[in-house]
Design a protein with these regions (language model features):
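Low-complexity, polar/charged sequence tracts that form flexible coils or short amphipathic helices
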Residues: 159-161
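Transmembrane beta-barrel domains of Gram-negative outer membranes and organellar outer membranes
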Residues: 1-121, 127-148, 152-155, 164, ...
C-alpha cells in the first residue's frame, strides 16, 4: 500500500474479527467464562509527496463490539460499542538504500491519534488524544525480507504510555 513515486497514493479496506473467551489481564484470567466479540472495518490511505515523505491515515469503524462483564450480583452485564474509532495520522520519513544484492529503508515516523467520539462505559478504542513516534528498519534480497519496528505512544488523559513492536521475516517463493 505504500507507493514510492511522487504524487502516488493508495488505500485499502480490511475487515477484522476479534473473539475472546475468559477475559484476561495479562496472562491472568480476570473474568473466566466471560467473552468479547468485536467486528471492525479498517479504512487506510497513503499519499506520497516524494518517495521519502508521505502521509498515512488509519480510521477504524467498529461495526459491533460486545463484552460480557460481571454485574456485581452474580450475573452478566453486556456492554456494547459501535462507531468510529480513533483517527491515526502518521508522517513516515524514509531513508532508502541500495546495496549489492540488498535494498531497504530506515523510517522515522511522528504520529498523532485523534479521538472522534466521546468516552462511554465500554470503549474499544482509547478515545483520548495521543502523540507517538515510530522507528523502523527493513531490507530485502531476491529471496528474503526482514523488518523491525517499534512505536511509542503517550496520551492526554489517564491512559498509560504504550510501546508496540514488530519483527517480520519473509521468504520469496518465486
Amino acid at each position: 500500500m505504500m507507493p514510492r513515486w511522487s504524487g502516488g497514493w493508495g488505500y485499502q479496506v480490511h475487515y477484522e474479527v476479534i473473539n475472546k473467551t475468559d477475559l484476561l489481564m495479562g496472562s491472568n484470567k480476570l473474568y473466566p467464562g466471560f467473552s468479547e466479540e468485536i467486528n471492525i472495518m479498517h479504512f487506510e490511505g497513503v499519499y506520497t509527496w516524494k518517495k521519502e515523505i508521505r502521509i498515512i491515515a488509519k480510521l477504524p469503524y467498529v461495526l459491533s463490539a460486545e463484552r460480557e462483564m460481571p454485574d456485581g450480583s452474580g450475573g452478566k452485564l453486556i456492554q456494547k460499542d459501535s462507531g468510529w474509532g480513533d483517527l491515526n495520522l502518521g508522517l513516515p520519513l524514509k531513508k532508502y538504500f541500495n546495496l549489492d544484492g540488498k535494498s531497504g529503508s530506515s523510517t522515522f515516523k511522528p504520529m498523532v491519534r485523534i479521538p472522534l467520539s466521546k468516552k462511554d462505559d465500554y470503549d474499544f478504542y482509547y478515545k483520548e488524544f495521543g502523540v507517538g513516534l515510530g522507528f523502523g528498519h527493513e531490507f530485502e534480497t531476491a529471496n528474503y525480507y526482514f523488518g523491525i519496528g517499534t512505536a511509542w505512544w503517550i496520551f492526554d488523559g489517564n491512559r498509560p504510555a504504550e510501546i508496540h513492536s514488530s519483527l517480520d521475516f519473509g521468504y520469496n517463493f518465486e
